[in-house]
Amino acid sequence: AGDEVITCSFSFFATAEAISAVGATPVFVDVDPATYLIDIDQIETAITPATKALMPVHLFGRPVDMSRLMAIAETHNLKVVEDCAQATGAHWNGQPVGSFGDVGCFSFFPTKNLGAAGDGGAATSNDDALAQTMRELAVHGMPKRYLHTALGYNSRLDAIQAAVLNVKLPKLKGWIE
């Protein structure tokens, strides 16, 4: 309540929806007209005492300047949640998108560059405790079978979607090139 998350004004509705779903308010920053990605120069001026996180949106297979964005996040002690739905397989300075911030979010909707046959997605984190919490929440809040310690969700990828992605994933690099 009262928390703000800075994100890009040019994205699918799901970006702002995810922010609102946790009770925060999306604060929109315009795009850089040269890249159509979040204008890094505008982020710092949008930060207020209520700002808790940045949510950059990597679009068109192009990554946001994560060096500059992460420096801003570090300066202001902000969390970073990367929206990688439109840039699976993209890299910034040799590092894959989704591996810079606290969380990376990916979509496998059929229209994405790594699309399944239906809906699906993944979240990544380099923080072991956070990754474990995400895994538990994805299976109804269960850290082990039939033990529910939190109110979770049914966010498991079904076998058919996984099979489609298993066939497509080795081809992703070639498709990107």
Features from the language model and the residues they span:
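Short, hinge-like loop/turn segments at secondary-structure boundaries
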Residues: 44-46, 72, 96-100, 123
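Hydrophobic/aromatic ligand-binding patch that stacks against planar heteroaromatic rings
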Residues: 17-19, 72, 96, 113, ...
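PLP-dependent aminotransferase-like
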Residues: 1-84, 91
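Active-site region of PLP-dependent enzymes
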Residues: 87-93, 100-177
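A generic hydrophobic-helix recognition signal that picks specific residues
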Residues: 51, 75-77, 95, 120, ...
